[in-house]
Structures are given as C-alpha cells and as structure tokens.
C-alpha cells in the first residue's frame, strides 16, 4: 500500500511540475501559438482524454516543447456529430460534463469558435507502420503511415473559453488580460501548494 501511495504521489508531483512548466512558458510570451481543431477532437485533448493529434503535416521543430493554444472551429460537421454519439467519444464527453440535448439529436453542447485550453506540445512524430498507440488513442485519430502524431504533455483547460477567429495552420493568438490573470493566479496557487507540501 505504501509503495502504491508513493507512486501516486510521485505521479501527481510530476503532473504538477509539468503544468507549472506550461504556465510559466505561456507567461514568458506576448502571444501563444495556436492550432484550430474541429470538435469533438479538440475538446478531447482539452479534457485530457486524447494525448495526440494526427495531422497530414508536422509541427515545425521550433514549436516543440512549448505551449500551444487549442482553438475550436466554428462548426460541428456531420462527421463530428456522428462521432460524438460513438464510443469512446460519447463516454469521455459525458465524463467531462458535456451532454447532448436529447430533444434534438446530435445537438452537443460543445465549445465553438473559442480557445478552450493551452497544451504543452512535446513533438510531432512521423507515423510508421509499427507506430505504437493504444486502442482508445487510435480511435481518436487517423494513424495511417506517413501522417504525423502531435504529442501533448500537460494541458491547462481555461476556466472561461475565449472567443477567437481561427485560421489554417499554426497562428498567433493574443490572449485577453483576463487569460493572463487566470494563468498567473493558477501558477501562484500551484507554487503556494508546493511550499506548503514541502514543509509538511
């Protein structure tokens, strides 16, 4: 039992450290590099269910190991509506508090035209025939050889999503003052918690 507790505490500490690294990096820039997603794929990343985003093109190396704002585009496509009702999307969306309006089929209450989270982009790896990915993660993307898996680390989900106009490819997002304040407050809180634990 002790070893399990120690392992859990170690994992939580690593998660906190990674989140602090993400938030600190965001505060060091005037803008944040952003990527637009179609939902529900973007929301799945924001809630931590989806760890990789598959694209036909790689993220340039200069953006690796840095923050990436997750923007949701303005429409819920027919394919997306269908996907929302299928496993594992349906389960992870419900678990995160999203629900469909049963009076109107497929009317999912998902964020649109908004930046909803900021993630740490680890790298973009070219997918090969022997690329390893678990079953659930594979169901979240298109892992055909030759495509690229954008791998995410820590993710900070904004308390209040921010309206924004997305673009193709990577683009620069200038957060509102309220976003900077929220991130600074979260970082200060994590630091305070760390100081308390270190003296416990």
Which sequence ranges carry the predicted segments?
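Structured alpha/beta reader/binder surfaces that contact nucleic acids or chromatin modification marks
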Residues: 4-9, 13-200
